[in-house]
Amino acid sequence: MAKNKLPLADVTEAPHYHDTWTLLRKYRDVVWSLEVSVRQVRNRFRIDYGKTIEDFLESVYLAGADLSGTELEHQAKCIEQSHKMLCLVDSAVDLMRAKHKNGEEFYWLLYYSYLSPQELQNVEEIIDQLRPHIRDISPRTYYRKRKEAVEVLSSVLWGYTAQDSAGIVREFLQ
């Protein structure tokens, strides 16, 4: 009986794959921007209103004031959206780390490549940091495993495509 195989598209051509790469490449910048934005809003409230943002919002809520359409509402929504995106990525990375068979290894690959607070200068520095977590790692192995880690993270973030699922079901049924 011949195996019925569908041609598989190159994973690097899938849009969710590129979305994940873009998301990871911008992760540090988004974290930085979010921290700066929150700090600026907090400082502005202390200067303008003489109280914390939490105290200000509580007094607005108690007074029944409506902040719709204000600059404050716009800033809050931007900060909230960035925070939710970071939480989504962090949650997906945590799930991958805890549940995937190579999760711990993939976590450290993604951490030193994209998620750590300080960007490392080059692949050699990343590999040096990875050595305690992944033995016998070479630059070639690093790139291969990093690609695998991004693919796994993509599947957690965006789900499997129907084509991916069909292949899994075929393998399971054989």
Kindly give the residue locations of the regions a language model identified.
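Short amphipathic alpha helix immediately N-terminal
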Residues: 101-125
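Aromatic side chains
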Residues: 17, 27, 114, 142-143
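Short, well-structured alpha-helical interface segments that form or flank functional binding sites
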Residues: 22-25, 84-91, 104-108, 137-144, ...
